[in-house]
From Swiss-Prot:
Recorded name of the encoding gene: rimP
Pfam families: DUF150_C, RimP_N
InterPro entries assigned: Ribosome_maturation_RimP (IPR003728), RimP_C (IPR028998), RimP_C_sf (IPR036847), RimP_N (IPR028989), RimP_N_sf (IPR035956)
Species assigned in the record: Salmonella gallinarum (strain 287/91 / NCTC 13346)
Protein name as it appears in the record: Ribosome maturation factor RimP
Major subcellular site: cytoplasm
Amino acid sequence: MGGGLSTLEQKLTEMITAPVEALGYELVGIEFIRGRTSTLRIYIDSEDGINVDDCADVSHQVSAVLDVEDPISVAYNLEVSSPGLDRPMFTADHYARFQGEEVALVLRMAVQNRRKWQGIIKAVDGEMITVTVEGKDEVFALSNIQKANLVPHF
């Protein structure tokens, strides 16, 4: 998540984008989490928001595609959900869309001896984002972002 999708995640994204969009939803992103029981998590959104029926419709459609294509060699659970208040960020477009909002980042490789950063999204330039952290601008490569989420404020 955040940038630098795995080869499997790229392949899955290519396979399921069209079916998700055909149902009228935006494919926000996907995560494939390997474990004893692996999980394929799909995040969807729409202008009207997402409810349980929307998730069920997408799950049914995506399951049919995955059953035919069979891209995942291990047993897994399929989860479809809205991005929620702490919306995950996957693409440069997501960062641009939420410019001015607060984001929490976990990096693949430390920058200045830190892997965790939190600040305001200031700018997006190609595959680089600028985040203002404690009054100072820090630049991160999307490919170095392991996980990124908006920080909700109540």
